[in-house]
């Protein structure tokens, strides 16, 4: 499973947790972005596991992209954004899941989901046998978010992006791109389209989402249009990322 945790040890069989997640003085404010709680990332990749086993101390694990920009799914994406800002890139290949980890925390007997991600609500419920509740966004949370990924606009390409629902039939689409779920859209030039999954598989679509943002952004279209995916399983997290990318254009 790929998940970021506020005080939880989670596997497919059982869950144990400690509600005391306030950071100790040994943890620098820079690691928690000034927040009082510690979040623990649980990586799924064997290369990261190997690195952690070699070290005798914990490591901070910020995102490998600039704030508000498209998340990377390959070492090339990281280099594109962070070149000359970091000394090394540990290349473990392209991301298998594509979108970020799920972020969860606890309140009494409930599991709170702060950010939808590659571990689905269904998987968390099955593993923990505990009720799961989404943390709803608010204007205050957007100003001082509890965790990463909670601001209204995020993960966005530089090219203005719109939902397919915003398409006006009178619009000139000759220099516009389209990101679709599983089929070509006749309103757009076929060569201007990126299909996330030819067979309609949500996991494949998730793994391709950010790559589609990078590829289509590089083509310098006037506008990008994207369609919503089925609101189930990992599709919820994909739609969350689409919503935040579109919001940048609206603001």
Regions found by a protein language model. Give the residues of each.
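Active-site-adjacent structural elements in enzyme catalytic cores
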Residues: 1-251
């Amino acid at each position: 499973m790929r998940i970021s945790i506020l005080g939880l040890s989670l596997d497919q069989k059982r869950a144990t947790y400690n509600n005391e997640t306030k950071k100790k003085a040994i943890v620098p404010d820079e690691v928690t972005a000034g927040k009082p709680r510690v979040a623990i990332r649980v990586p799924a990749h064997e290369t990261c596991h190997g690195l952690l086993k070699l070290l005798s101390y914990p490591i901070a694990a910020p995102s490998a992209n600039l704030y508000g920009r498209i998340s990377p799914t390959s070492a090339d994406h990281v280099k594109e954004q962070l070149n000359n800002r970091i000394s090394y890139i540990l290349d473990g290949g392209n991301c298998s899941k594509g979108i970020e980890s799920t972020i969860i925390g606890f309140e009494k007997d409930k599991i709170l989901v702060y950010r939808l991600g590659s571990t689905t609500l269904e998987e968390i419920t099955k593993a923990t046998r505990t009720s799961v509740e989404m943390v709803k966004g608010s204007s205050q949370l957007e100003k001082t978010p509890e965790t990463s990924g909670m601001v209204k606009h995020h993960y966005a390409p530089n090219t203005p992006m719109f939902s397919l629902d915003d398409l006006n039939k009178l619009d000139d689409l000759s220099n516009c791109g389209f990101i679709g779920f599983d089929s070509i859209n006749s309103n757009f030039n076929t060569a201007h389209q990126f299909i996330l999954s030819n067979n309609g598989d949500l996991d494949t679509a998730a793994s391709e989402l950010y790559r589609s943002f990078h590829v289509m952004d590089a083509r310098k279209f006037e506008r990008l249009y994207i369609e919503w995916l089925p609101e189930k399983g990992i599709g919820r997290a994909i739609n969350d990322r689409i919503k935040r990318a579109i919001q940048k254009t609206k603001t």
